[in-house]
Design a protein with these regions (language model features):
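N-terminal helicase ATP-binding lobe
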Residues: 1-295
Length: 295
């Protein structure tokens, strides 16, 4: 099953697309590839499943904590199924700086949250770029890290960098240098994006590009309406799922106080980690149930 994408995807009730089968084959070797595919085409599974099927450690790196939160549930489900089918425990680590958690999945279907110090000893590690850089290359006084030389070749490790088009300025420079370091060290990695300018591709050390074929997909029109009174605009869209974006946290907080009630949520980068996650979960539940809300 390690070399059979059809059989491995079937474990989760899925069927691989031609693009996912191609990535599965490329990942057999020593990939240093760019995967270009639109949102919703299964990039996550395309990159992750080859590592899970072959028993490699997967380090999945995202630009933001919210994207890590979004993927956590999916990987918990996958590892729980694998632990039961393979008859051996699996582990997931979530490391975002604000939150460090380790989940152990037993063959009997049990799930246990633990606080072990050796965070990166797991089958799947979900983290952000800034935290990965800190953990692997943190040589400041008092935070010396030997994770990179000690762990990077412990097992066959595959690094996956998703949504890389979101990196800008300093973050992009740091990312580019990290990719160069991994490439020169012979470490396996995949870089994923929905889109990437040619100039950006040229800056990365890559073996090749796998591009998802263009497909006709349903389109959604987003109307940008910066003018007008926010309260009036909101009232005219009652009963719908509405995202209200303001320039400053103070403005958003004041508007939230005026509207506070059922289905009204405030979300911004200064929220405490626990509150941010609670808001995110509630909004996701309403989205799934297609219930109205105001964010």
């Amino acid at each position: 099953k390690a070399d059979d994408p059809e059989a491995f995807y079937a474990r989760f009730g899925l069927k691989p697309t031609p693009f996912q089968r191609e990535v599965f084959k490329v990942a057999e070797g020593d990939p240093a590839h760019l995967l270009l595919a639109p949102t919703g085409t299964g990039k996550t599974e395309a990159a992750a499943f080859p590592a899970l099927a072959r028993g490699a450690r997967l380090v999945f790196v995202l630009p933001t904590r919210s994207l890590v939160d979004d993927l956590e549930g999916r990987f918990r489900r996958y590892l729980k199924i694998l632990a039961q089918e393979e008859g051996r425990p699996k582990a997931l680590v979530v490391d975002t700086g604000h939150r460090q958690a380790r989940f152990r999945f037993s063959p009997d279907g049990q799930e246990e949250a633990t606080k072990e110090r050796h965070l990166y000893h797991a089958d799947v590690i979900l983290t952000t770029l800034d935290k990965l850089l800190y953990r692997y290359f943190g040589y400041a006084e008092g935070v010396k890290s030997y994770t990179f030389p000690r762990r990077i070749h412990d097992r066959r490790t595959l690094f996956v960098f998703d949504e890389v088009h979101l990196y800008e300025a300093t973050a992009w420079v740091n990312f580019r240098h990290l990719i160069a370091s991994l490439y020169k060290a012979g470490v396996r990695f995949l870089v994923m994006s929905a889109t990437m300018p040619g100039t950006y591709r040229e800056e990365l050390l890559l073996e090749g590009t796998l591009e998802h074929p263009a497909a006709k997909r349903p389109s959604r029109v987003l109307r940008y309406m910066p003018q007008g009174n926010p309260m009036e605009i909101i009232q005219s869209h009652r009963g719908k799922r509405v995202l209200v974006v303001l320039e400053e946290v103070k403005e958003a907080a004041e508007l939230y106080k005026r509207l506070k009630g059922e289905g009204v949520f405030l979300y911004h980068g200064r929220l405490a980690e626990g509150q941010r996650r609670r808001v995110f979960r509630k909004v996701k539940r309403r989205d799934k149930a297609q219930k109205p809300y105001l964010l």
